[in-house]
Amino acid sequence: MIQGVIFDMDGLMFDTERIWATLWEPALAGLGLSYKEGLDEAARGTAGDSMRAVLRRFYGPDCDPDRIIEALHEQGVIAFQAPPPKKPGLDELIAYLEAQHIPMVVASSSRMASILRHLNNWHMTDHFQALISGEQFSASKPDPEIFLLAAEKLGTDPAHTLVLEDSYNGVRAGAAGGFVTVMVPDLLPADDEMRGLYTMECTSLNEVLAKLKTGEL
């Protein structure tokens, strides 16, 4: 039985990943660098040392990953002045979980300022027991540490805690932590690796809600 739910944010709650994917080129161009194919996919869902490792892999050990990350986030502040669209089924899922007295946490690789901006724009902050940002950790997703802290905030065992994720790195983190991990794909479909890791794949948050109601989750 599910006793708590952990939400990723970008690409799961809000339709933001498509926008982030377009921000790499201007961010890198401002630093005299060009976008390299596969960077967005490799970096998606990461933060901190995990993202730095990705950037060094693409741009070499002598690159300044923090400068690139800061340039990317500067582009994000401009791009997200208007609230991004909510994913279909988000409001209904949250309402159901609240009615069932199932606590919820947001655990995102994004900066806390970004998490607060999106949630406050939609007046959603009060629905969650805690908000956890990847910038709080040296190792973010695919390391499970962020989800383990979320479970601690919920007061639930990972085996009875649902992780909702769209990214490969998020699914890897959920599986590594022993969580009930459901992938709701956004930009990238599930591949063989993901199918070997997740508990279930759902096409939308509406399907997650349906599975909870029928007891399949």
Predicted regions and their residues:
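Conserved G/P- and acidic residue-centered "switch" motifs that form tight phosphate/ATP-binding loops
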Residues: D8, L12, S108, D166
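Residue-level marker of regulatory loop/turn positions in helix-turn-helix DNA-binding domains and
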Residues: K86, A107, A139
